[in-house]
Each structure stands twice: as C-alpha cells, then as structure tokens.
C-alpha cells in the first residue's frame, strides 16, 4: 500500500516497484514519459503536453459517469441517465469541435488524448448493446445519434479503431455498436 495507497485498478509500478501510478490517464502519461522514443504522443512542446492534459482532464467526468452508468444499466435512474447524457454531450461535443480544426484531438498528430478518446468512447458505446434494458426502464441509449450528431468525432473514432495498432488492442469492443 505504500507504493499505491488506494489499492485500486488499474495500476502500474516503476521497475523497482517503489512507485505506484494509478488511474488510466496517469498510466498513459507515465508510459509515454518512460518511452525512449520521441513519438510525440504527449505533444512536442510543453504547451502541447498541457493541451493533451486538458483533453485527458475533460474526459475524467465522462469516464467516471460512464462507469457508474454502464455498471447500473439494469437499474438505471433518471438522475444517472441525465448525468451521463450531460457528461457525454460535454465530452464528445468538445472532441467534435477540436476536430474541426485539425486531424487529431489535441495536436496535429496522434497523442494519448486520441488514445484515451477511442478507449473511453468505445467503452461507452457498449450501452447500445443494452438498449432493451434501457427501453424497459423508459430510457433511450444516449449515444444513438452519435454518428449524425458528432460526425467528426465518429469518423475519428472509427478511423483510429481501424488502424492495426488500435484494432489489435480493441479487439471486438466496437463490434455491434
């Protein structure tokens, strides 16, 4: 517990096991910082790194609400559905707006902001597989209009998910959504 006081997952540790890193975005950052390659995944300048951080931070509320929402789909409440809808709209509309001006979320090249976006949004889109449970409780899936409402965000998700480096890790996550 010294290295990781919260004891939650996901978690990563320094090679000697002395330092624990927890939470997905922190693990993304640590992985890129530890890389010996200059691949630009955390931006190329300090300001680009801060912009990447901004998108990762904006995704935190979305990710937290999505976790609560997805785990409770069978007993969804009006409040939970409304909170998730607001978090979804805020996050995905910001991504869509950013993609008006460049091909990637935070900078002009692929960064961990894009990786986090694909992973978080891909996970959330699984709600569509639970449409029957939602309808039974009087709700529609929040993401039903994703393709039309946020076309740039949708195209970005699907184009990145089709790339081998994403497809190899996503597997069948986006199948049927």
Regions found by a protein language model. Give the residues of each.
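GST-like domain detector, emphasizing the conserved glutathione-binding G-site
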Residues: 1-85, 90
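Short amphipathic alpha-helical segments and their helix-coil junctions
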Residues: 10-11, 89-104
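Active-site-flanking alpha-helical
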Residues: 32, 36, 120-121, 170
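Surface-exposed helix-capping loop/turn segments at secondary-structure junctions
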Residues: 37-38, 97-108, 131, 163-170
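GST superfamily/GST-like fold recognition
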Residues: 52, 105-140, 144-152, 160
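Structural signal for well-ordered, non-membrane alpha-helices
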Residues: 60-63, 92-96, 157, 161
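Alpha-helical packing segments of well-folded alpha/beta enzyme cores
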Residues: 84-95, 120, 153-156
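Long hydrophobic alpha-helical segments typical of transmembrane helices together
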Residues: 143-177
């Amino acid at each position: 517990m010294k290295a990781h006081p919260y004891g939650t997952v996901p978690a990563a540790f320094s090679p000697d096991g002395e330092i624990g890193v927890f939470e997905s975005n922190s693990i993304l950052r640590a992985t890129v910082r530890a890389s010996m390659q200059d691949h630009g995944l955390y931006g190329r300048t300090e300001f680009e790194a801060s912009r990447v951080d901004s998108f990762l931070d904006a995704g935190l509320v979305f990710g937290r609400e999505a976790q609560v929402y997805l785990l409770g789909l069978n007993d969804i409440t009006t409040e939970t559905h409304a909170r998730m809808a607001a978090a979804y709209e805020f996050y995905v509309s910001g991504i869509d707006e950013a993609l008006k001006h460049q091909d990637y979320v935070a900078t002009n090249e692929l960064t961990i902001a894009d990786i986090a976006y694909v992973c978080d949004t891909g996970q959330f889109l699984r709600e569509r597989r639970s449409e029957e449970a939602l309808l039974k409780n009087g709700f529609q899936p929040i993401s039903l209009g994703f393709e039309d409402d946020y076309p740039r965000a949708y195209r970005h998700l699907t184009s990145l998910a089709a790339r081998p480096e994403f497809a190899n890790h996503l597997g069948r996550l986006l199948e049927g959504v």
